[in-house]
Design a protein with these regions (language model features):
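Short beta-strand-centered interaction patches in the first periplasmic/extracellular domains
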Residues: 3-78
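An acidic/polar, Gly/Ser/Thr-rich interaction patch typically located in mid-to-C-terminal regions
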Residues: 74-210
Length: 210
């Protein structure tokens, strides 16, 4: 079996009640993690729960940052070709989150807010103010983290992995430079283009608002 490890900032997040039905233990934990913009996965002999977009490994250890450079002759016909896009379409849509909870003592539905307007309202109604506030905070972190979404197609590198970090150096346009947190890494291979990777990344925690 695995030894559990929970990031300190998630250790005291309130969960009043959650039902597990027709899903594996891993699926159940993944569903709970997503509610708080977190990720859960096995790492060695540990099963770890931590925030998405953190500037550290899921195991709690600092990750090496992999630097990517645009090659001098960046042409599609070259094996070293890099293609990248940044989507900032959701940057200013919401600045805050509202979540509802049922106040049993008063017999009314109440709301809590995280951030400032314009607000996104969560559809689910929560069982306590603490649970609603935690859910709103997790959604707000997700909104800030995904304010910029980076997609890169580049030469393959086995060190590139989800939850890792990349650094785009001065060979990149100014609006792309800096650290990014990898959300997904997809490896591809073909005779024509060789071993390639498609990277999907967002801002790491602490960089939001660049």
């Amino acid at each position: 079996g695995f030894s559990p490890r929970v990031a300190p900032e998630l250790d005291d997040v309130p969960i009043e009640h959650a039902d597990q039905a027709d899903e594996t233990d891993m699926g159940f934990l993944t569903r709970l993690a997503r509610l708080h913009d977190a990720v859960t996965k096995p790492v060695g002999e540990r099963y770890v729960l931590a925030r998405r977009g953190q500037v550290k490994a899921i195991s709690g250890q600092e990750l090496p940052v992999i630097t990517l450079s645009v090659p001098p002759n960046n042409q599609p016909s070259e094996m070293a070709f890099i293609n990248a896009t940044v989507d900032r379409s959701s940057r200013v849509r919401f600045q805050g989150v509202r979540a509802a909870w049922f106040d049993g003592e008063e017999g009314v539905e109440a709301t809590v807010e995280q951030g400032a307007g314009p607000f996104k309202r969560l559809r689910q109604s929560y069982q306590s103010a603490g649970e609603a506030s935690a859910a709103a905070g997790g959604e707000l972190r997700k909104i800030k983290r995904q304010a910029a979404k980076l997609r890169i197609e580049c030469p393959g590198n086995p060190e590139l992995a989800a939850e890792g970090l990349i650094q785009l150096d001065d060979t990149w346009p100014s609006y792309m430079r800096g650290e990014w947190s990898l959300d997904r890494v997809t490896a591809r291979g073909s005779r024509r283009h060789g071993y390639r990777c498609v990277l999907e990344a967002t801002w790491p925690e602490g960089r939001e608002g660049d």
